[in-house]
Structures are given as C-alpha cells and as structure tokens.
Regions:
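Conserved beta-strand-loop-alpha-helix hinge in the C-terminal portion
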Residues: 207-229
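Helix-to-loop junction immediately C-terminal to a conserved catalytic motif
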Residues: 46
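ABC ATPase NBD coupling module
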Residues: 62-77, 98
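Conserved ABC ATPase signature
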Residues: 126-130, 134
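Catalytic Walker B motif of ABC-type/P-loop ATPase nucleotide-binding domains
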Residues: 151-155
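Helix N-cap at the start of a conserved alpha-helix in ABC-type nucleotide-binding domains
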Residues: 162-164
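Conserved ABC ATPase "signature" region
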Residues: 104-122, 174
Length: 230
C-alpha cells in the first residue's frame, strides 16, 4: 500500500500538492494536461525529486527522503533509460543482476521476457543499433523483470504500434495482479487505459481532483476533466 500525504513541491512559480492512498494490486491511470504534474508526481515517488513538505509511505514505512535505490519502486519514462554501449541482454538483465552474468539461467530469463514484449532480435546486439520502438521495448522488459512493489509507467507505450500496446497493457495487468504490484500508468491514451483499469487519478493545476481515485464515470462529472477531454 502507498500513502501520499500533503506532498508538496515547488518549482519557480509553480506549486504541486498530492494526497491519495493506493492499495496493493491497484492499477491506476494518471491523467492530466501536459505540465499538470504527472511526471513531477512520478519523480517524487521514485525519489528523483525531493519534496518541500509532506510524506510518502510504502507499506507503512516512510520513504519520503530515501534514495531511489532504497525504494521498492521501478519507473519507466517515455524516453527509454537504456545504456547504449551495452547489449540487449546486458540492458535487460541489469534489472535483477548488476553483474550482468551470462549464465544459462539469466539467458533463459531474458529470452522469456523478450518474448513478452515481442522483441525477436539477437540479444547480443547493441541497444544503440535498435530502432526507437525496439529500444523502448528493451526498457519495458527490464522494468517488468524487476517486479518491484510499485511500478510507475510514464507514457510508456506511446511510441509502439496499437497491437503491441494492447498486448503490453494486458501483460502489465496480469503481472500486477499476480505479483500484487501497485501500478500507476500516465498516458493520454485514455481509451486504452480503460481496457486495463477503471481507477484514475486526475491531476489538475498541480493537485489531484478530490484527492482520491475516481472511476471514469465519476470523472465525467468533473468540469475540469470535461475540458481536458475537449
């Protein structure tokens, strides 16, 4: 379970404040206009930004000022976080083995996760030689492999074709439910998000509307959300 309480962050003249609770296995779509605070929220949760005030609790433990490496949270940005000088295998297995050992066990793990993201390429190939969509799938594979308690996906599949996006959304949903992972997905592709969840956080002007999860039908009653859809 994750609890965010009066989490405040200020950048120049812009202020953000977040309040909400999420349970294990919750899959939540995070919606809002560009600049509303979606990426800011993810960076605060992951520890890449330090808040000016407030608290973040994960399973009852306060993690507000822990380093990113000390949090049981995995994050995937729209711009993939790959190491271009490393191979596909090394980039993926790095998620669970910092030494990147080419054991039979590790090779099997990487091949299996590559199948899940429809990546049918020589795993010894350098990531720098891949297309943008292929590089994104490498990032997704590494992220899925880590199986952290919290999974943050920031516009994760936008560069991929609709068929693969649908498959990956299904994989994320299955993995989240099976492993009791709390998953937040930021995306403008609302119709696709609705295929995996009816739980949403809508960020408007730096704050979460009603400070809680709302269903899509509940959001439709909100004036700001209606304007967002136009």
């Amino acid at each position: 379970m994750i609890k965010v309480k009066k989490l405040k962050y200020r950048f120049k003249s812009t202020s953000f404040e977040f309040n909400f609770d999420l349970n294990s296995t919750d899959i939540v779509g995070v919606l809002g206009k560009s600049g509303s605070g979606k990426s800011t929220l993810f960076n605060l949760l992951a520890g890449f930004l330090s808040p000016n005030d407030g608290s973040v609790f994960l399973n009852g433990k306060k993690i507000t000022f822990l380093k990113p490496s000390q949090r049981n949270i995995s994050i995937l940005f729209q711009d993939h976080n790959n190491f271009n000088h490393l191979s596909i295998f090394e980039n993926i297995i790095l998620g669970i083995d910092p030494d990147m050992k080419q054991t039979q066990s590790n090779l099997k793990i990487v091949k299996n996760i590559m199948k899940k993201v429809s990546l049918n390429i020589d795993l010894q190939k350098k990531v720098s030689d891949l297309s943008g969509g292929e590089q994104q799938r490498v990032s997704i594979a590494r992220c899925l492999l880590r199986k952290k308690s919290i999974l943050l996906l920031d516009e994760p599949f936008n560069s991929l074709d609709p068929g693969l996006r649908k498959k990956l959304y299904e994989d994320v949903k299955s993995m989240s439910l099976t492993n009791q992972i709390t998953t937040l997905i930021s995306s403008h592709l609302i119709e696709e998000l609705k295929t995996v969840t009816d739980k949403f956080l809508f960020i408007d002007k730096g704050k979460i509307v009603e400070n809680k999860i709302l269903s899509y039908n509940q959001l439709l009653k909100n004036k700001s959300f209606k304007e967002y859809l136009q």
